[in-house]
């Protein structure tokens, strides 16, 4: 190992074999031995500072790196200085000889100027791309009234003139076209109705470029004779960019088009309608929006939108009879049915028409007269009309019908007096209302819908609500509407006179009020009204606890009770379970209820109508008679009611208004003692079991 200037050297074999310390070879080339570990990047000065506790040096020593950079910078500067000195010594600019260094620089500086001169000469003789006049110079020269243009040095910039032909580069000045604002300002001083066939911007109309051939065509069509004849200057003389022999191309304007714009000579006259701004392009709205949108009509039509609705005749008829009933358009079937109801001749054909109206229950809204059962074809034609498809959806029927009922109840309360007269004077109307209420109450939901919207098939039930669903609009309900204009769903509420009945305090949770006013026709026992059954059960609950079965049978067959219940359409078949009232004032309420319910029965004077339904009365009264086997229990000469027995049927006639029998079991028990004293422990136990079974 040889140590030279602090660096160790050894032969290559000894370095590979890790025998550096014992290497003494002299016949082989020596190599520098790398120091072990990482090389130290800290200078000696920084090492000394780290040993000193008082000093706080930086973590990384940059002294060596900075010195290297400084040394490299010095070397570069010295090399530049030497090169300059050498050029100075070899420069022969002062002598006749050509200098090697400075002559080359001068040639590089002079070459653009020579090409610039060539470009100018070529552009003047054969212009490759000629630029039109700028907007500022065009406005200033046209509005000043002088024919002489400003110098072309202000128009043709140096960037355009420096471009050599054939290089393939187009300067951005070529794309400069007079802006629309400059054109509008140019034309603002003149009338907008002036004909554009007289050219007002000669550079635009006198210059055209053919992109296929690359030729520039200049036409000075009557420019020197039209506007600039006063000053004696022509566009051709003042413009350097135009060639001298431009007259040979006067007829080229018809063959070529101008750059980016049509010729002003071909433009139309500006009318006052389209004089918003010169240069604007008007695009018709039908180009983007169809001329006839569904439900909107023609977009550009200035007429009212009322005439643009594409309604068919059937839709207009259905819509007018429901939504615009107050405007007088609903004249289709209303007058006919009003005359039918108010007429004094009650023939069989009229009654058949009335029953047909009640059974099919189209109620003069969907169509007039003969079209009641033939509306399906017109409804199917308009299934794709958007808004009407929503109303045919069965999910929206219940919500809209509920709102319709509320509106009809509010309106119907204002017509109490008129309906009382019609109800009392027209027995035919009472018969119609009776059959209608019976068809509504005693049929299931599907059968009611079937009877309400006509004898339709599977898909016609939802379609019948098409016009009905449009009714609950508070804007379209008239102040006074007739009875025949009512919707089918609210007939059972609004067609009867509004006689408010006292609220029942029955313990039955399923208690319902009787939906119809008292009439003379009783229903079959299979369609028993729940409200009537619960009412009668409450009345019989007192006697069922402390009386024999014979007394119950006597009370059921008592003519006074039958007369009282005949105004509520039905009598229950049998009493299976007793019921007890909750309050002590139950008996008084029952007495007042029976008095009020029996009052409307006195309005009926025609007993012959009751003979139309002997079978129904027979079906109603036959089970109690057979089950109890007590025909002698009927008191025919009772003070409260009379019975006419014809074969198997029995018809009750109303008695006096306030004649309550004093001998009936119900009245005797009600006046005897309060119900709290009638119950024993066994009675309370039975009542508890009965309530738990409910």
UniProtKB/Swiss-Prot annotation:
Residues annotated to bind Zn(2+): 11, 14, 23, 25
GO molecular function: copper ion binding; DNA-binding transcription factor activity, RNA polymerase II-specific; RNA polymerase II cis-regulatory region sequence-specific DNA binding
Modified residue annotations for Phosphoserine: 125, 231, 241, 291
Biased composition regions of type Polar residues, renumbered to the chain: 111-126, 336-349, 566-577, 664-677
GO cellular component labels: cytoplasm; nucleus
Cited InterPro entries: Copper_Homeo_Regul, Cu_fist_DNA-bd_dom, Cu_fist_DNA-bd_dom_sf
Span list, region Disordered: 104-128, 209-240, 332-388, 479-514, 566-588, 650-677
Miscellaneous comment: Present with 339 molecules/cell in log phase SD medium.
Function field: Regulates the transcription of a set of genes, many of which encode membrane proteins. Among the genes regulated are YGR138C and YRO2. Does not seem to be dependent on copper.
Protein's recorded name: Transcriptional activator HAA1
Organism the protein comes from: Saccharomyces cerevisiae (strain ATCC 204508 / S288c)
Chain's gene name: HAA1
């Amino acid at each position: 190992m040889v140590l030279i200037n602090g660096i160790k050297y050894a032969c290559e074999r000894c370095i590979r074999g890790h025998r550096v310390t014992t290497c003494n070879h002299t016949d082989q080339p020596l190599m520098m031995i790398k120091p072990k570990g990482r090389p130290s990047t800290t200078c000696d000065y920084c090492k000394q500072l780290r040993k000193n506790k008082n000093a706080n040096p930086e973590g990384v020593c940059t002294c060596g790196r900075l010195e290297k950079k400084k040394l490299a910078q010095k070397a570069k500067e010295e090399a530049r200085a030497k090169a300059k000195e050498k050029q100075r010594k070899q420069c022969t600019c002062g002598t006749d000889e050509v200098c090697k260094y400075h002559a080359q620089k001068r040639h590089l500086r002079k070459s653009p100027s020579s090409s610039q001169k060539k470009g100018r000469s070529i552009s003047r003789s054969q212009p490759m791309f000629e630029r039109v006049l700028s907007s500022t110079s065009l406005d200033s020269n046209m509005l000043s009234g002088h024919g002489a243009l400003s110098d072309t040095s202000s128009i043709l910039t140096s960037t355009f003139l420096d471009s050599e032909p054939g290089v393939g580069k187009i300067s951005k000045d070529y794309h400069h076209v007079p802006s629309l604002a400059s054109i509008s300002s140019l034309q603002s001083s003149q009338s907008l109705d002036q004909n554009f066939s007289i050219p007002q911007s000669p550079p635009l109309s006198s210059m055209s470029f053919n992109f296929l051939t690359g030729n520039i065509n200049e036409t000075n069509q009557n420019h020197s004779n039209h506007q600039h004849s006063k000053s004696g200057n022509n566009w051709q003389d003042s413009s350097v960019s135009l060639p001298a022999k431009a007259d040979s191309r006067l007829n080229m304007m018809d063959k070529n088009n101008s750059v980016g714009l049509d010729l002003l000579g071909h433009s139309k006259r500006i009318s006052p309608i389209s004089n918003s701004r010169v240069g604007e392009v008007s695009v018709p709205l039908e180009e983007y929006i169809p001329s006839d949108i569904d439900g909107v009509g023609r977009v550009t039509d200035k007429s009212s939108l009322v005439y643009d609705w594409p309604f068919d005749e059937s839709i207009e008829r259905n819509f007018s009879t429901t939504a615009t009933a107050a405007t007088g358009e609903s004249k289709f079937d209303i007058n006919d049915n009003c005359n039918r109801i108010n007429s004094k001749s009650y023939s069989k054909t009229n009654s058949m028409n009335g029953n047909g109206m009640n059974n099919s229950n189209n109620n003069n809204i969907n169509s007039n007269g003969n079209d009641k059962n033939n509306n399906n074809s017109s409804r199917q034609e308009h299934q794709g009309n958007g808004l009407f498809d929503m109303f045919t959806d069965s999910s929206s029927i219940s919500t809209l019908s509920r709102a319709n009922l509320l509106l009809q109840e509010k309106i119907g309360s204002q017509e109490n007096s008129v309906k009382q007269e019609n109800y009392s004077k027209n027995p035919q109307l009472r018969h119609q209302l009776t059959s209608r209420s019976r068809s509504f109450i005693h049929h299931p939901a599907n059968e009611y819908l079937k009877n309400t919207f006509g004898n339709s098939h599977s898909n016609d039930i939802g379609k019948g609500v098409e016009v009905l669903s449009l009714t609950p609009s508070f804007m379209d309900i008239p102040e006074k509407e007739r009875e025949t204009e009512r919707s089918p769903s609210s007939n059972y509420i609004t067609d009867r006179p509004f006689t408010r009945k006292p609220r029942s305090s029955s313990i039955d949770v399923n208690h319902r009020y009787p939906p119809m006013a008292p009439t003379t026709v009783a229903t079959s026992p299979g369609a028993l009204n729940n409200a009537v059954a619960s009412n009668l059960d409450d009345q019989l609950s007192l006697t069922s606890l402390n009386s024999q079965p014979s007394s119950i049978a006597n009370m059921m067959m008592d003519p006074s009770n039958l007369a009282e219940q005949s105004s509520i359409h039905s009598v229950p078949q049998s009493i299976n379970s007793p019921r007890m009232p909750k309050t002590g004032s139950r008996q008084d309420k029952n007495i007042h209820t029976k008095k009020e319910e029996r009052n409307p029965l006195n309005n009926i004077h025609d007993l012959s109508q009751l003979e139309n339904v002997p079978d129904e009365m027979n079906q109603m009264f036959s089970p109690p008679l057979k089950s109890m086997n007590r025909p002698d229990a009927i008191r025919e000469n009772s003070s409260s009611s009379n019975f006419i027995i014809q074969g198997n049927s029995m018809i009750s006639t109303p008695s006096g208004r306030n004649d309550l029998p004093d001998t009936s079991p119900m009245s005797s028990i009600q006046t005897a003692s309060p119900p709290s004293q009638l119950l024993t422990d066994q009675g309370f136990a039975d009542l508890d079991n009965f309530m738990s079974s409910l």
